[in-house]
Amino acid sequence: MQILSRCQGLMSEECGRTTALAAGRTRKGAGEEGLVSPEGAGDEDSCSSSAPLSPSSSPRSMASGSGCPPGKCVCNSCGLEIVDKYLLKVNDLCWHVRCLSCSVCRTSLGRHTSCYIKDKDIFCKLDYFRRYGTRCSRCGRHIHSTDWVRRAKGNVYHLACFACFSCKRQLSTGEEFALVEEKVLCRVHYDCMLDNLKREVENGNGISVEGALLTEQDVNHPKPAKRARTSFTADQLQVMQAQFAQDNNPDAQTLQKLAERTGLSRRVIQVWFQNCRARHKKHVSPNHSSSTPVTAVPPSRLSPPMLEEMAYSAYVPQDGTMLTALHSYMDAHSPTTLGLQPLLPHSMTQLPISHT
């Protein structure tokens, strides 16, 4: 586990520790043209700078002092003497123009301005960086010489890839960070990880560092905390039930008085009354809650159209005896006589009236 460090921005160095020499060319039999010898490789990946020798230096003397046998040049690839007009020279070894090729893709390097050599193997630029190039520890892509990078405990990152594993925030230069199991954490989420580990250890639960790390989903959508259930004492229930019997929907002042008497908050008492009203409404019979007594209408206020409706009502009650009594009563009294009655009988006031 890497203790908190500070970010630093660095330029990438691709081939500073590898041997990468330019292929020199010479024309045999032309003393006035000097052999081109490569310079040492620098920090850049091209490494293709070269400088011509003076005309006094002959190709044969250069070849003899560079690994070729005196009097002839032997190709390092095929082992045959080089009698061509041109030859290639890499790392003090001579090559036919057609024989110098990449050891991976076998691409001819005769027309390339540079090549790379490592452990006596020749590589083109593409295959060299595929095999030995520096990769970002976060995204796995290659890091080029022009890229800005950050280094942490031997790991190299692109600037955009050097971000917190939990919140995905890119870290700035000088900001504290931690490297935990190859994962970069900002200071805030590093402390959160330590708190999670400490809490699980205190609870006796085993947890790994991977499990203690917060993911982006946990940061953006944290799990809601479980709501603690409220328990009431017998005295508190007695006070609230007595109030509910008097008024099942108390106002704010009554709620405040109940809160002072019970020691509960107004919100808790209000929720308790809401739940009680819902239960009461659910268990009360619909017939009892919706039934209203039918009041008798004074005959003086009954208009003739209403008498006609009452006389010819199409109401059919469930009880057949009531229907028979109604017909017998209507046969015995005319509508005019019915309108002059001072009061309707009590039994008739209970009959429902319907309109057609």
Swiss-Prot record:
Positions of the UniProt region annotated as Disordered: 23-63
Record's GO cellular component terms: chromatin; nucleus
Pfam families to which the protein is assigned, alphabetical: Homeodomain, LIM
Biased composition (Low complexity): 47-63
DNA-binding region(s), residue ranges: 225-284
PROSITE patterns: HOMEOBOX_1, HOMEOBOX_2, LIM_DOMAIN_1, LIM_DOMAIN_2
Residues of the signal peptide: none
Gene3D superfamilies per UniProt: Cysteine Rich Protein (2.10.110.10), Homeodomain-like (1.10.10.60)
Highest taxon listed in the record's lineage: Eukaryota
Domain called LIM zinc-binding: residue spans: 73-133, 134-196
Keywords: DNA-binding, Homeobox, LIM domain, Metal-binding, Nucleus, Repeat, Transcription, Transcription regulation, Zinc
One GO MF term attached to the UniProt entry: metal ion binding
Entry keyword Signal: no
GO BP terms, alphabetized: forebrain neuron development; neuron differentiation; regulation of transcription by RNA polymerase II
Location of this chain's protein in the cell: Nucleus
Primary site of residence: nucleus
Function as written in the Swiss-Prot or TrEMBL entry: Transcription factor involved in differentiation of certain neurons and mesenchymal cells.
UniProt name for this protein: LIM/homeobox protein Lhx8
Species for this entry: Homo sapiens (Human)
Taxonomic classification: Eukaryota, Metazoa, Chordata, Craniata, Vertebrata
The gene coding this protein: LHX8
